[in-house]
Amino acid sequence: MARNYGFCADHESETVKKTAASKIFDTARDLFYRRGVRAVGVDEIVCEAGVTKPSLYRAFKSKDDLVAACLKESAREGSEAIHAAIAAAGPDPRDRLRAVIRYYADKIGSPDFRGCPMTNVAVELPEPGHPGRAVVEDCKTALRGLTVDLARDLRVTDPEALADGLMLIIEGAIATHHIFGSQGPAQSLTVTCDALIQSHLERRMA
């Protein structure tokens, strides 16, 4: 059923004004993740947040800037969680690399998983000049760099190839989840990554 945006408030109380930016941000982030940045418009965001459109443009210069802000927060949260998982894994290089894999396996297995926010937006925003696209590229580049560093700690002969292979498996698991869910090919994420790591270790010892 189409939403009637005509019932959105025209005036804001002082309380709403104080919290408008955070309401807009939280609402937009949820809508963008669940439905996509292209499908969600400014009218829907302000209606869901219970604020007026001028409030949005006081807090964010444009919808594109709001998209970028939401992605930056997702990137920050993801980076903190991954680094925490690595730290908790202890000193063993293999365990530290596997911590990244387990992080994604756990995310994919969660009931509210709707894909990687960065990968989703990369498909929706192919234009290189979009501020959201820049956040996505920075995030994925940082993840690749981290994975290469962890693979290098294993002393394998080609850490870049191992890291790229692991990223391909992870991205493939995320993509197939959209079709098959967590019980499809994505459930093989950990074992497939382990097999790839083992093959690189055996190549090192050959």
Give the predicted meaning of each segment.
Residues 72-79:
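Short, basic, alpha-helical segments at the C-terminal edge of helix-turn-helix-like DNA-binding modules
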Residues 2, 23, 27-65, 69:
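Helix-turn-helix
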Residues 69, 83-112, 153, 159, ...:
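Hydrophobic alpha-helical connector segments
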Residues 95, 110-131:
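Amphipathic alpha-helical segments used for helix-helix packing
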Residues 131-141, 152-206:
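Hydrophobic/aromatic-rich alpha-helical bundle segments in the mid-to-C-terminal region
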Residues 1-19, 201-206:
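N-terminal intrinsically disordered/low-complexity leader segments
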